[in-house]
């Protein structure tokens, strides 16, 4: 069936309140969309992260009288009289199929592919990780995840132990295992990430080789041949005393989730204990790698 879409602009401070009003007015769904294609990262547990300039979009049945809806919304404190909005008629589509059509297998480095489950793998002889796009955790589309996957693909991981610090979907740990690592350890602050990583590892047949910890429960004596942390610049700096202890002597460290403009600040937190490589960049993002001294 066709739909009517009501779109209006908001800030991160009032977007949720506006969304609540759209639901109260009869919207069958409400979504939040970045107005300016600004990167945003996975929220902390219990936190909703929105863009500073956010479009709030309400979807209504095609038979809805939108003049009545607008009049109702004008009487709310968060919007008021004459609020700016746009109303559009949406044609009937198979929205799930259209969403699925946007995702294709992606290649990282020489051997590694990340493939949605509904697509055929391009190369059955390659290293294929089956991972479906989700709302919360990484699937390889972000430049920082891509940089980390390419780095892992270029390492000799045979028989190695890998720690994925801030594992999210588990994509990096799972990729490392598929690339030959003997064991992987995933650490995250979010229980949902732990569950997502466990589910994705089972889907890829590597669950027995993946150990998962909430950050508050991780053992004190963890160490690995390779450590990768794709989080944010602030946490990478703050957690440097912890992350720096994880690679064994001669082990590899890979850090991302960092804007190129933040690279020097992050590198300074690690340069005493690691021999750092030249920074790799993709779009405005970067990856910092090095070897434990």
Curated annotation (Swiss-Prot):
Q: Please verify whether the record's keywords include Chaperone.
A: no
Query: Which InterPro entries does the annotation name?
Result: Ribosomal_L11_MeTrfase_PrmA (IPR050078), Ribosomal_PrmA_MeTrfase (IPR004498), SAM-dependent_MTases_sf (IPR029063)
Gene3D superfamilies named among the record's database cross-references: Vaccinia Virus protein VP39 (3.40.50.150)
Question: What sort of enzyme, by top EC class, is this?
Answer: transferase
Q: Where does S-adenosyl-L-methionine bind?
A: 145, 166, 188, 230
What are its GO biological-process terms? methylation
The superkingdom listed in its UniProt entry is Bacteria
Catalytic activity, EC? 2.1.1.-
The protein's GO terms of the molecular function aspect are: protein-lysine N-methyltransferase activity
Function summary = Methylates ribosomal protein L11.
Q: Which NCBIfam families match?
A: prmA
**Which family is annotated?**
Belongs to the methyltransferase superfamily. PrmA family.
- The name this protein goes by in its record: Ribosomal protein L11 methyltransferase
Q: Which organism is it from?
A: Proteus mirabilis (strain HI4320)
């Amino acid at each position: 069936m066709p739909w009517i879409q009501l779109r209006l602009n908001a800030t991160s401070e009032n977007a949720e309140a506006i969304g609540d009003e759209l639901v109260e007015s009869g919207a069958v769904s409400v979504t939040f969309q970045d107005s300016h294609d600004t990167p945003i990262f996975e929220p902390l547990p219990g936190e909703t992260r929105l863009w500073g300039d956010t479009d709030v979009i309400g979807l209504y049945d095609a038979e809805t009288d939108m003049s009545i809806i607008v009049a109702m919304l004008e009487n709310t404190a968060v919007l008021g009289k004459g609020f700016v909005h746009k109303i559009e008629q949406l044609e009937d589509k198979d929205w799930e199929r259209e969403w699925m059509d946007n995702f294709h297998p992606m290649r990282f480095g020489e051997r590694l592919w990340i493939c949605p489950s509904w697509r055929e793998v391009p190369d059955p002889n390659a290293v294929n990780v089956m991972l479906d796009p989700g709302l919360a955790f990484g699937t390889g589309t972000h430049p920082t995840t891509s940089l980390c996957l390419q780095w892992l693909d270029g390492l000799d991981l045979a028989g190695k132990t890998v720690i994925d610090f801030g594992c999210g979907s588990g994509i990096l740990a799972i990729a490392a295992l598929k690339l030959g690592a003997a064991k992987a350890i995933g650490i995250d602050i979010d229980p949902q990430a732990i569950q997502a990583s466990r589910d994705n590892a089972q889907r890829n047949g590597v669950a027995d080789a993946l150990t998962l910890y909430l950050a508050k429960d991780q053992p004190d004596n963890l160490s690995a041949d390779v450590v990768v942390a794709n989080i944010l610049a602030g946490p990478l700096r703050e957690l440097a005393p912890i992350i720096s202890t994880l690679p064994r002597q001669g082990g590899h460290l890979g850090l991302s989730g960092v804007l190129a403009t933040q690279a020097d600040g992050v590198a300074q937190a690690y340069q005493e204990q690691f021999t750092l490589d030249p920074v790799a960049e993709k779009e405005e993002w970067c990856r910092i790698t090095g070897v434990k001294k």
